[in-house]
Swiss-Prot record:
Gene3D superfamilies: Glucose-6-phosphate isomerase like protein, domain 1 (3.40.50.10490). The keyword Ribonucleoprotein applies. SUPFAM superfamilies: Ribosomal protein S2. GO terms for biological process: translation. Belongs to the universal ribosomal protein uS2 family. PANTHER family: 40S RIBOSOMAL PROTEIN SA. One of its GO terms (cellular component) is small ribosomal subunit. This is Small ribosomal subunit protein uS2.
Amino acid sequence: MSDENLLTTLDTYLASGIHIGTQQKTEDMRRFIYRVRADGLYVLDVRKTDERLRLAAKFLSNYEPEDIMAVTRRVYSVGPLKKFGQVTGINTVAGRFVPGTLTNPSAKKFAEPEVLFLSDPRVDKQALKEAIEIGIPVVGMCDTEHLTAHIDFIIPTNNKGRKSVSLMYYLIAREYMKNRGLIGEEVPFTYDDFLEKAMNVKVKMNSAPRQRGRFQRRPRR
């Protein structure tokens, strides 16, 4: 496999471990699996991950940043997610997702995004449940063991490692900004900026969305 047409170099992808799955697989994720190693770990197809990353960023770029909510409860994803929100302006929920955030208008942090971006459909199950209830599309990072029936757009990846989640958020942020015409070839942030945040696992978990602007529900496209 060459680097041609990839969002980053193959070496960068492999060094981050985005292709390293788990020892479990589901039928939902079978199409994204390249092989199984001798130790039983399923390996994801890097080219398919790259393709889905590109398409996910293009899909998200149809939405204003204030109309997207990105969430995670995974410790190693908290820092990179906050950096993702900082550079894109997308609203983030890092840590506990308060029940009713999307479904209870009386809730203190009630929000009305048009699309939800998850780091893990199982760990972020409360946010996923509420997105299903209100009928908004869901983009999700999914590993080999995940069920994806309610994920509208799957990004197959190792969503547990510091390096892999940092690379995912960096690439999606970069492509989202490029697709919206906000940056050119000179990118004002780097993968290392995101990775640095992932290395700080003592970041305080914040259950409240970043308030860049009030969510406004728009007619479905």
